[in-house]
């Protein structure tokens, strides 16, 4: 059974998934790859394996009106005509030329008809065939690359091996004794930790016991980064300088340390994306260059006893986890801008299926919403990229790819198929750099997919996949790859689930660093013309597991009883307009059922909007709440994440729990000011939010870092009011 999307409502208009296209064997040569952006048969119908070519050609031939023999004769005639055209003098008779051209056009038409018919068949293929194509196990074509490398030896951007290069010290030639000692410390959970605060950013660095947990100097540019020669000029142009939070994080990124960054914004996302693209591309090129050099060396010194440990079990080395196809397009654009390939195979197909225009109706939406959902926001995708010296190939099979870019759902679907025999995650066995961007958005989709993927990284493969074990690095064979792998995660804010990744999955012997901002608090940045009373009520909760029950009890006995009295007593004065915001969907269902069945709320009219509510019901609930027919509206945080509607008619906001995203707090409190004539009255209703000691992370983002300490030290039942 395929894993659930778990992403709330149906996606926006641009987010529909394009039909899966099967590889077609019509165009088998590389002649059309010279101009990747030109419209060609090779772009629209990517090349496949020989067996697929023959099968597809036979299918097209069955549908054509001519027989197989006639097709063969037509093909022979076409070749003869080409030879004739080459041999014919340009000054020959015009009548003869017209006859040749007519025959040539006729043969071309036959082939074009076959392509069109093949395209119609491709559109009918199901997702299972796309999965099979992605996982098609081909032997890595290193021989082809090696021949190309040898033929272009003069142009090879060969770099001398530098012992100070983190790639050398961390991956290629680590000191065995030091590596063993650090792995033992990591497995024993013995870390040395240091902390510091700088420029509104709190840094926590941890290294295995025995190493010094000092902080690296800031990085203002890429001048001292050990980049491949091919990337040095382009990287300097794309990233002329490094500033802001990036200058504190870049040293750890290029040093192959694990990084958790919890202050991602729309403004700093672009420079961080370029830095990570440079790092990922640099790692791929260095890895491939080392393999190709050793291939040539092994071929020249066949009698020598060489110990060439330069590989993992499988070829893919970099994994990107991204929230949408458009996010994937942005990453690929950064990579191609740095790599500047002479050819980009299947680029047109990539843009056609992954990119889309922005929805102009979203101009009034917040910038973070537009960044996440603009363009093609489909969250079901996966893409393999293969690098050669001058080419990037899109839609490469995973086992011949150097880099995999995917959504958690798209990758989980291929790893966790209904048929146990088809499940496969061996292509993740040798991943050395993992980049998870916009992790907070991934959590709103389905965090279980992210967790599943991370737990299946760097496991021992079930099959050999053509691996030359004599060239596998020792720490792969010892099942220690997870301690050398680098994991980089960027998020707009830190949640307990993201913190769990830092604790459980970031086990790098080079160390790890976590960066979180110092928060001023969303309560001080409300979009209202008047001050509003904001009350935070703390309740006792013994454990995270018991927190939902304690929260529900406190809400029904303390908060809801007061609301019922206020609304009932003020019915003649048109009281109501109570918006109850509920972060968790499970809590939402529980509260909704209580409103529907409890005698306590029998006299209240209410509406409910969640991420699973049908659009027609959403419109009806909003309308009834705005005109007063519903005095209470239950509203889920995930719905707000996916839609960002402005709810009118709000006179009081009650937060069943503090929202994870601090921006949502300000936006929802801002609903009080949508009606300018009633803004003063709405401000009197104010805001009331419930919290427990387990809400410390999200409470800090709302009330601010300085206020958090006192609120966490007080006992349950205490109330904190801010104006």
UniProtKB/Swiss-Prot annotation:
Any Pfam family: UTP25_NTPase-like
Keywords per UniProt: Nucleus, Ribonucleoprotein, Ribosome biogenesis, rRNA processing
Ranges of biased composition (kind: Acidic residues): 51-72, 118-165
InterPro entries associated with the record: P-loop_NTPase, UTP25, UTP25_C, UTP25_NTPase-like
Disordered: region residues: 1-179
Domain of life, per lineage: Eukaryota
GO biological process terms on file: maturation of SSU-rRNA from tricistronic rRNA transcript (SSU-rRNA, 5.8S rRNA, LSU-rRNA)
Compartments (UniProt record): Nucleus, Nucleolus
Subunit and partners: Component of the ribosomal small subunit (SSU) processome composed of at least 40 protein subunits and snoRNA U3.
Family to which this protein belongs: Belongs to the UTP25 family.
Protein name, as recorded: U3 small nucleolar RNA-associated protein 25
GN (gene name): utp25
